[in-house]
């Protein structure tokens, strides 16, 4: 695993996941019942596996090193490396109607809209008739300029969107969205939602980086990100109470 990924994983594991805490547990508990078959897409190092009964759960990830870390830390759960989905011909290696829930936590904002649309089609194929997606993503909020910039500084994802844009992207692949909540944890605004497939036809959607990301992205093209990510986060924790 590269230094960049190690630093990002450190921040995610030691700050973002613990700070979500009970909010994520309560959110998942509203939708998941023991016996539901769950696909955790973009499971990373497996931290969310403990939200589900191990026999119900399988986590998938394209990064082999993260799958290895997840297997070591959570041996009671199942993890699988999957190929990157980049065309209509690429498939996630599971049968149709295999899952009751697709869980997506802090993943989509790393993926461009054209690939998200391909993934949404695959999720629809793999979900059973009453199945749904439940997800958590950082979101841009109106008039929250400092935290909107902060999320883009600390996060490696290029596509932290507004809730409206996330909804448009899902709707373009025939999903109905149920807005659940917005949880704020030390500068991260986390949108909790569910999405269920409908029978409408798909339509076009082309998204991209927000103005915040376009401003911040050059920082991520240097070697400074991994070196300074934790320091920036700690400075934020110090500064926010002062300015508020």
What do the PLM-derived regions correspond to, one by one?
Residues 1-22:
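Class I SAM-dependent methyltransferase Rossmann-like catalytic core
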Residues 17-34:
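Conserved alpha-helix/loop element of class I SAM-dependent methyltransferases that forms part
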Residues 35-44:
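Conserved class I S-adenosyl-L-methionine
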Residues 44-90:
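Class I SAM-dependent methyltransferase SAM/SAH-binding core
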Residues 90-96:
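Short conserved loop adjoining the S-adenosyl-L-methionine
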Residues 103:
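A conserved beta-strand element that flanks and buttresses the S-adenosyl-L-methionine
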Residues 117-129:
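A short glycine-rich, Lys/Arg-flanked "PGG" loop and its adjoining helix->strand segment in the class I
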Residues 135-173, 177-190:
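C-terminal alpha-helical "lid/dimerization" subdomain adjacent to the S-adenosyl-L-methionine
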């Amino acid at each position: 695993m590269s230094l960049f990924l190690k630093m990002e994983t450190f921040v995610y594991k030691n700050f973002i996941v613990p700070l979500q805490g009970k909010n994520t547990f309560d959110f998942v508990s509203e939708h998941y019942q023991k016996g539901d078959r769950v696909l955790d897409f973009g499971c990373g190092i497996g931290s969310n596996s403990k939200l589900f009964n191990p026999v119900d759960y399988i986590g998938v990830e394209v990064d082999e090193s993260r799958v290895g870390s997840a297997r070591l830390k959570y041996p009671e759960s199942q993890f699988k490396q999957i190929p990157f989905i980049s065309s209509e011909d690429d498939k996630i290696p599971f049968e149709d109607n295999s899952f009751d829930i697709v869980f997506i936590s802090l993943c989509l904002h790393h993926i461009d809209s054209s690939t998200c649309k391909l993934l949404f089609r695959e999720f629809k194929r793999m979900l059973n008739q009453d199945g749904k997606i439940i997800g958590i993503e950082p979101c841009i909020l109106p008039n929250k300029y400092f935290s909107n910039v902060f999320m883009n500084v600390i996060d490696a994802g290029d596509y932290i969107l507004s809730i409206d844009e996330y909804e448009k992207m899902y709707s373009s692949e025939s999903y109905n969205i149920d807005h659940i909540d917005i949880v704020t944890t030390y500068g991260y605004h986390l949108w909790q939602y569910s999405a269920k497939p409908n029978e409408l036809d798909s339509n076009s959607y082309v998204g991209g980086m927000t103005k915040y990301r376009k401003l911040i992205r050059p920082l991520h093209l240097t070697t400074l990100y991994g070196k300074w990510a934790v320091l920036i986060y700690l400075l934020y924790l110090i500064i926010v109470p002062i300015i508020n």
